[in-house]
Curated annotation (Swiss-Prot):
Pathway: Secondary metabolite biosynthesis. It comes from Aspergillus thermomutatus. PANTHER family: 2-MONOOXYGENASE, PUTATIVE (AFU_ORTHOLOGUE AFUA_1G13660)-RELATED, TRK SYSTEM POTASSIUM UPTAKE PROTEIN. Belongs to the PheA/TfdB FAD monooxygenase family. This is FAD-dependent monooxygenase ankC. It catalyses: cyclo(L-arginyl-L-dehydrotyrosyl) + AH2 + O2 = cyclo(L-arginyl-(Z)-dehydro-3,4-dihydroxytyrosyl) + A + H2O. It is found in: Membrane. InterPro entries: FAD-bd (IPR002938), FAD/NAD-bd_sf (IPR036188), Phe_hydrox_C_dim_dom (IPR012941), PHOX_C_sf (IPR038220), RIFMO-like (IPR050641), Thioredoxin-like_sf (IPR036249).
Length: 587
């Protein structure tokens, strides 16, 4: 039987959150893409559920934040309970969960399948991406003699479609492949990469329940450390559910027999850890168990043609709720780079930065998870959490929120030599949430909400006090230089920069008509663009670490700062951009 043959720009193997975020980028950038998934349908119960603030910023950039927050459960408070050696269970602490500094969201919870559905619905609005279920990848061959040809399709994949009568096979030729196929990644095995790390004897159960309980903090994010008995961690979920993590075995105990784990055992252990309070299970929607292991793939890319993202790269426990977030951020880092290369806008060498930027994040994820498991094990032996561990847990909060990532690959990040506060505008870190007021309308925005994920680079000009003639002249000179950079460096297919200006003058002291055209342009169809000039709301310069003289900040399509310089430093900005857009010379 002759196999059907086809060609595609990008083949994504796996339609979980990591694969779908990669597909979202391809959809936004118009890249012909197929997503294949062996499951017959999206995940309906169970799976990951934690959403950290950085993921919400990503969702907003794609335009799906409101759909997420309409159905999620925000984490509004935390409680810590401990049982001492005498068997007494008491609350040690209870606190509200504040929104992180310079961010619009705190963390929240939503079942993975619902997140997948929301992303899929937005992808389906774009014709360039197709998602196929019940499709299995059977073989992968990389034609190495075609790697240096930009328009070649060197990745040859055999797909088996199990949804057709009797099954059928197809030969797909792809320019690039993304393996988002989970911890047992088929793609990783085809590439010959190995998972390096350790498997522990720590065993946990996880279950989603509808319960009735007299426990006072049942609707908070609650940790219970029970002396000599194990730990319990639970969180309020959507639709009246509660997600419970139940410790069945510590890492320092003898091997726990996995075959003995049942739904009844989990509920019995849960009820025992809550005593003297009662808990009645009205419905069990899902349960599972896992032995904790920490593994990291020894490779993430092959020839910069096949890429691994998410659990295909890093394995850990689901206890701290970071896995889905880090997995999506892997794809958020890769997607714009891959789309830009395919559109012949970006230098193909940019693809090498995926592994150099994301491997340190994966390693940090595993260390963070290892620490939290150690924290649980120690607390259940002693009945309390040691002070040094609590201090370190506090220090890890930026990592837990997704804000500790600091990229340092020199192709995309020009490091600053000046001392900066941790939440300032720093090359390599995500651009923070800073509130400004639209000059024309007075409407308040967070600058970050203006940085949409469409594959464009963003230029943010902190202009200073434009009521001063010298500052206005510097600003307009900068605007003219930016227009020249657009014409000389940016590929025509990319269009223009997303330009945002933030000044410190009174609104009545300047008129938009006095500004360079790039800050107040005219479109033949939509007319004047009033959405480029904003006023500082008294503190945004200080919060950003920007001085009175202002600055120019170049933000990548994924909202990370690439370069920061003085308003007059056209040469510095040009020097940053040229290696990235070098492909224009060959387009």
């Amino acid at each position: 039987m002759t196999k059907k043959e086809s060609a595609v720009d990008v083949l994504i193997i796996g339609a979980g959150p990591a694969g779908l975020i990669a597909a979202m980028w391809m959809a936004k950038c118009g890249i012909t893409t197929r997503v294949v998934e062996q499951r017959p349908y999206q995940l309906r119960v169970g799976g990951a559920d934690g959403i950290h603030p950085r993921s919400m910023e990503m969702f907003e950039s794609f335009g799906i934040d409101q759909e997420i927050t309409q159905v999620w459960e925000p984490i509004t408070g935390w409680a810590l309970w401990c049982r001492n050696a005498e068997g007494t269970l008491a609350r040690s602490d209870r606190m509200d969960n504040p929104t992180p500094v310079r961010c619009r969201w705190g963390p929240g919870l939503l079942q993975q399948g619902i997140i997948e559905r929301i992303i899929k619905e937005h992808i389906s609005e774009q014709p360039s991406v197709r998602i196929e279920h019940e499709t299995v990848s059977a073989s992968l061959v990389i034609m190495e003699d075609a790697l240096d040809k930009p328009d070649s399709h060197p990745c040859v994949i055999t797909l088996r479609h199990d949804d057709s009568a009797g099954g059928s096979e197809e030969l797909v030729r792809a320019k690039y492949v993304i393996g988002a196929d989970g911890a047992r990644s088929w793609t990783r095995k085809q590439l010959g990469f190995k998972m390096e790390g350790t498997r522990t004897r720590s065993v946990w159960a996880v279950t989603d329940l509808v319960v009735v309980s007299d426990f006072p903090d049942i609707r908070l994010c609650t940790t219970i450390n029970s002396y000599g008995e194990g730990g319990l961690f639970f969180l309020r979920r959507e639709r009246g559910l509660t997600r419970f993590y139940v410790q069945l075995n510590r890492a320092d105990e003898v091997e726990f027999p996995a075959a003995s784990i049942t739904q009844e055992l989990i509920i019995e252990r849960l009820q025992r850890l809550l005593r003297p309070y009662t808990l009645t299970v009205k419905r069990c929607e899902w349960w599972s168990s896992y032995t904790v292991a920490h593994y990291l793939s020894d490779g993430m890319t092959k020839h910069d043609r096949v890429f691994l993202v998410g659990d295909a790269v890093h394995n850990h426990s689901p206890l701290v709720g970071l896995g889905m977030n880090i997995s999506m951020q892997d794809s958020y880092n890769l997607g714009w780079k891959l789309a830009g290369v395919l559109k012949k806008e970006l230098n193909p060498s940019i693809l090498s930065t995926y592994e150099t930027e994301r491997r340190p994040v994966a390693a940090e994820l595993i260390e963070t998870d290892r620490f939290h498991l150690q924290l649980f094990d120690t607390a259940t032996v002693t009945g309390s959490e040691p002070a040094w561990m609590l201090e370190r847990e506090e220090a890890l909060q930026p990592s837990m929120q997704g804000f500790a990532v600091h990229y340092q690959d020199p192709l995309l990040t020009v490091a600053t030599e000046k001392e900066c506060r941790p939440d300032a505008v720093i090359p390599g870190k995500r651009f923070p949430q800073l509130n400004v007021s639209n000059h024309a309308t007075g409407k308040v925005y967070s600058i970050q909400s203006l940085l949409k994920s469409k594959g464009k680079f963003h230029v943010i000009v902190f202009a200073g006090d434009l009521s001063q003639p010298l500052e206005l002249n510097r600003f307009n000179t900068c605007g003219t230089a930016l227009q020249q950079i657009e014409e000389q460096i940016l590929p025509a297919s990319m269009g223009k920069f997303n330009v945002i200006a933030v000044h410190r003058a009174r609104k009545t002291a300047i008129e938009l008509a006095s500004l360079a055209d790039i800050f107040f342009p005219v479109d033949e169809t939509t007319g004047r663009d009033y959405n480029r000039v904003y006023c500082d709301m008294e503190t945004s310069y200080e919060e950003a670490g920007i001085g009175e003289q202002g600055a120019v900040v170049l933000v990548r399509p994924d909202q990370y700062v690439g370069w920061c310089g003085e308003v007059e430093d056209v040469q510095g900005l040009t020097g940053y951009l040229q290696p990235i857009f070098e492909a224009k010379k060959h387009a």
